[in-house]
């Protein structure tokens, strides 16, 4: 139907006849001449119709925005002074000789070049229109390049692309499962996989050795800007490699991809223990572009009369930390400080104590804060420890350790972005030495990653001191976003049963949920491990998108709904009867 894409029309085609197909991006009448900006996925070409072509000109007068047309004409240079250097096709135009309307269009719900003023709900409702925008098509094209690059890299390194089941059974992986009722097995349900975790481990036990899959995964959880109920994961697993070797391969993949697709040379990824990341940055995925750090000051405040500080300072499960913002005392207004106080409240902080350092040499008189008089004896060593200078402001977090880390960690990131403190464009790292377990709040333990992560200690220590046991897990972080997480897996059945027992999963429950895995571990299991990338997050970062919804063709909203198809929706009662499902009305509170 066509000889060229619109974006291919350039000076090399001058005096040649071309046939183009696409959407009318814009139609203009200038002095009796009709101009059509014709758009396809590769670009926009200007087509000109003059009155000399009577029938064709009359047809061109009927054209409106978003009509789908086929045009044939001769390529010529634009008149002097009319070139558009902002377009790759801007030096030429097509003098139209033929025109065929392939499809008409209603008035669009929004102009494609005015999308900034259009609400996201409207864009998602008419996603097929939204995706016509060059910005959106370019993101999809780039995503395709990323997946192609990943496949080529892994194929070239001996990995085998293997598909794993979508209909499987529910396993405890941290989030709620999407359940699928079975028609043929009454009262039983499949679960959509949160990850291919167990199947890829079974593939290692099957001798596949190196596996990968670009897999759809599903989690029924509360959504944020970087979460979707269904998402795409680059899943990787290897046999007979330790964590350093796995990290080396996957780091090389990311660095090569950034170099070849973005012309960005990422540095070697530094490695940081989990405990250091939490202490210095309040996060297990720190954004190292921001030159602000948390500093422990609790040991300086154990004897002050101010219980807001001394209480947590004397509690082993609490923390008092300081966050110094250089020149922040000069930069921030009282209203801004109040706004940041409200912000940390989102994370459970009861307030945001601060000290403004006006003139350090004047001692207490050079400080501005309602708390200074309560901690006067500790002021000098405190200022020295945080490196305070004139003009600074020092914020404090004083609460349970988790609250302090989350509140000051989030404040650190917000200050970095609000005040444009980012020192570099890209800051990758590995976070390593994660704890195996964390308290579940009910006297038990839950796995930091998942129950199949190998510990870095023997079974005896794991059983005697689970609180201090470390895992052989590792997370790849870029600009404060977790790109991927992985670990060396347990390949010994006794160790696996021990971990499940510590997690409160008894022998009967373990057999019922994981019997197939426990059996497989007893038939010769190689040491193995792997990593999974979030493809959506990776493409979001590489394209500079604000949300993963911008790099997914048909995403869900934050309420897990498709605005275009109105999914999820009601189903025919007959289908429910076939599945032996009866809906119960939820009782409304009086």
Curated annotation (Swiss-Prot):
PROSITE patterns (alphabetical): AA_TRNA_LIGASE_II
Upper classification of the organism: Bacteria, Pseudomonadati, Pseudomonadota, Gammaproteobacteria, Oceanospirillales
Any Gene Ontology biological process: aspartyl-tRNA aminoacylation
Residues the UniProt record annotates as site (Important for tRNA non-discrimination): 30, 81
Family to which this protein belongs: Belongs to the class-II aminoacyl-tRNA synthetase family. Type 1 subfamily.
Name under which the protein is recorded: Aspartate--tRNA(Asp/Asn) ligase
EC number: 6.1.1.23
Gene that encodes it: aspS
Region (Aspartate): 197-200
